[in-house]
């Protein structure tokens, strides 16, 4: 083999070797915004933190603490829900809030009327009881009391009627108070959900917490 053939074979071999070597570009680091999955994971972490805060707080013995736990749960639910569901619940919650506030105002008026009824019944019951007690102490009042049979029956009837009204109005007032507490808790939950759903978040927890509205505050 002559030198020309050797040189030709060598050049062909080097060309094939260079052709099969892959080109690896240098790495570049681009600053990118958080992806949707990362943002969802962050919001789920915040939701879990809110639930932990609600569970680790003091046992909700009072109505205010129970409302606080309900608000924590509503905010955690808002952060956990996907965006379309969150917006749907937000619109429904805004409409429901109007009806709940109207129902709350109606129940408060009923409770005020019952308080007036309880006060009047209590005064009449106390007065009739005092008349009956004085008739036992004073002989002259007892004599007049026995001579006027209609007066005795009227006083006893008023006492019995007002006592019954007093007991019934007290039970109804207690039930209305329970409904008021439950409605206020529902309002706090929906207002907290709407507030959390209305916030825009870029990943900063401090910015997230600035827009939170709790209950009727």
UniProtKB/Swiss-Prot annotation:
Domain of life of the native organism: Viruses
InterPro entries on file: Orbi_NS3
Pfam families in alphabetical order: Orbi_NS3 (PF01616)
Record-stated family: Belongs to the orbivirus NS3 family.
Role of this protein: May play a role in the release of virions from infected cells.
Name assigned to this protein: Non-structural protein NS3
UniProt organism field: African horse sickness virus 6 (AHSV-6)
Upper classification of the organism: Viruses, Riboviria, Orthornavirae, Duplornaviricota, Resentoviricetes
């Amino acid at each position: 083999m002559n030198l020309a053939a050797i040189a030709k074979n060598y050049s062909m071999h080097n060309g094939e070797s260079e052709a099969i070597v892959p080109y690896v570009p240098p790495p570049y680091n681009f600053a990118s915004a958080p992806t949707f999955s990362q943002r969802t994971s962050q919001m789920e972490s915040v939701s879990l933190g809110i639930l932990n805060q609600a569970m680790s707080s003091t046992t909700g013995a009072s109505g205010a603490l129970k409302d606080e736990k309900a608000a924590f749960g509503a905010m955690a639910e808002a952060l956990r829900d996907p965006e379309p569901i969150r917006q749907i619940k937000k619109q429904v919650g805004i409409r429901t809030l109007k009806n709940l506030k109207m129902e709350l105002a109606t129940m408060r008026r009923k409770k005020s009327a019952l308080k007036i009824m309880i006060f009047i019944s209590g005064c009449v019951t106390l007065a009739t009881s005092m008349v009956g007690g004085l008739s036992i102490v004073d002989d002259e009042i007892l004599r007049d009391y026995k001579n006027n049979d209609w007066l005795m029956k009227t006083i006893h009837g008023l006492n019995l009627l007002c006592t019954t009204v007093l007991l019934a109005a007290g039970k109804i007032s207690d039930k209305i108070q329970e409904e008021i507490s439950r409605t206020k808790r529902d309002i706090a939950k929906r207002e907290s959900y709407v507030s959390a759903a209305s916030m825009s978040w870029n990943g900063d927890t401090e910015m997230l917490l600035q827009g939170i509205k709790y209950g009727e505050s």
